[in-house]
Amino acid sequence: MSERTLFDKVWDAHTVRVLPSGQTQLFIGLHLIHEVTSPQAFAMLRERNLPVLFPERTVATVDHIIPTDNRTRPFADPLAEEMIQELERNCRQYRIRFYNSGSGQQGIVHVIAPEQGLTQPGMTIACGDSHTSTHGAFGAIAFGIGTSQVRDVLATQTLALSKLKVRRIEVHGRLGPGVYAKDVILHIIRKLGVKGGVGYAYEYGGSTIEAMSMEERMTLCNMSIEGGARCGYVNPDAVTFEYLKGREFAPQGSDWEEAVAWWQSLASGPDAVYDDVVVFQAAEIAPTVTWGITPGQSIGVDERIPAPEELPESERELAKEAYAYMGLRPGDPIVGTPVDVCFIGSCTNGRLSDLREAAKIAKGQRVAPGVKAFVVPGSERVKQEAEREGLREIFEAAGFEWRDPGCSMCLAMNPDRLVGRQISASSSNRNFKGRQGSPSGRTLLMSPAMVAAAAVSGKVVDVRELL
């Protein structure tokens, strides 16, 4: 039916039944777990003497709390050691596939599943992590869930969910030099707001999106949640299929052609009906930097921090709170803002293409005096490939630290933290108060290339000047 969206097709294909509450009981094709949100869920199973219904549909790794510098066991942080031991025990007991540190497959959960071909078009995917929307880049419907829902998926392989509206977001045209997928999604969030997507799934399309690589599409879908959406996705196409072909868990042989035919049928029809359509032009998007305490408080690198009267009335009080917390003044340019720490990594921007772009800026440069800069590959596989390409040497020669894979400073559940009033240039996804470990630490979100430019300059600069 040409009027159906991909979201409708995937939702209907996975509907078990409509519950008396009006919610849908949805079958979950792939469940991803990690060390932080799973221990309590397994404990709840044991309390009820329940098995994991489909252990073959669950995949585990360690990412949130694991250190990125010293992995000698036991870990220096006893809580990290305890939580990882618990995940190891649970995976053994319930026979769940587990990618531990040193396996060659460990990494941030939203990096390892796509790179192994576990994430595929038409799937429903759940994980106890907000940024599960990343997997929508493949034409999957992927939800971040809480611990009690992790329990539900382990026990029943289903979730009770309310069906979402669908907003199509189109971006047309060619991105300029120094403008990346990170800038596109920050621009979208700035324009639609951090609550603009509440109750929606975002479908991304248009010539700009179609021209993006899979890793760029993952960055885009990753931050759908920062825009208030429950999930985000891109219709699968030749770019998707080329990425998946030959990967470990992708269909093989004659099954491949059959899978591609089905995946192609999932794309939203030419007459698909949407609840809303929003259109952006790529030419209007510049390298973007957040200046405040939400991902929606951002500006182009060549702009000045807005005054309250320039903002919608509903945003003015939060803006005043942001000025005070960040120590920035309305009317000041964001260029020239000094930085103390520069972090390249996270499930948003810790993939190989991200490191390549940052390395182009770092090559032949030196990290500015007084700045701590470090690179955290998104997975052991990314790290190995980056080292084969010589990226590690480029970063280390420039004075960046080269780390092991993990979530690192994105959320600071591990030793990678800001101290005091330090301000970071970060390729991660959230700039909330205290997000990076210090209750008074400050975060400026930007692309990996912009972070590298800030690291070698000691301040926010326009990356286009270094290209």
Curated annotation (Swiss-Prot):
SUPFAM superfamilies: Aconitase iron-sulfur domain
Amino-acid positions noted as binding [4Fe-4S] cluster in the UniProt annotation, renumbered to this chain: C347, C407, C410
Coiled coil: none
Keywords: 4Fe-4S, Amino-acid biosynthesis, Branched-chain amino acid biosynthesis, Iron, Iron-sulfur, Leucine biosynthesis, Lyase, Metal-binding
One example GO MF annotation: metal ion binding
GO biological process terms on file: L-leucine biosynthetic process
EC number: 4.2.1.33
Cofactor comment text: Binds 1 [4Fe-4S] cluster per subunit.
Cofactor: [4Fe-4S] cluster
Gene3D superfamilies (alphabetical): Aconitase, domain 3
Catalytic activity: (2R,3S)-3-isopropylmalate = (2S)-2-isopropylmalate
Family: Belongs to the aconitase/IPM isomerase family. LeuC type 1 subfamily.
Protein task: Catalyzes the isomerization between 2-isopropylmalate and 3-isopropylmalate, via the formation of 2-isopropylmaleate.
PANTHER family attached to this UniProt entry: 3-ISOPROPYLMALATE DEHYDRATASE, HOMOACONITASE, MITOCHONDRIAL-RELATED
Complexes and interactors: Heterodimer of LeuC and LeuD.
Full protein name: 3-isopropylmalate dehydratase large subunit
Organism encoding this protein: Synechococcus sp. (strain JA-3-3Ab) (Cyanobacteria bacterium Yellowstone A-Prime)
Organism lineage: Bacteria, Bacillati, Cyanobacteriota, Cyanophyceae, Synechococcales
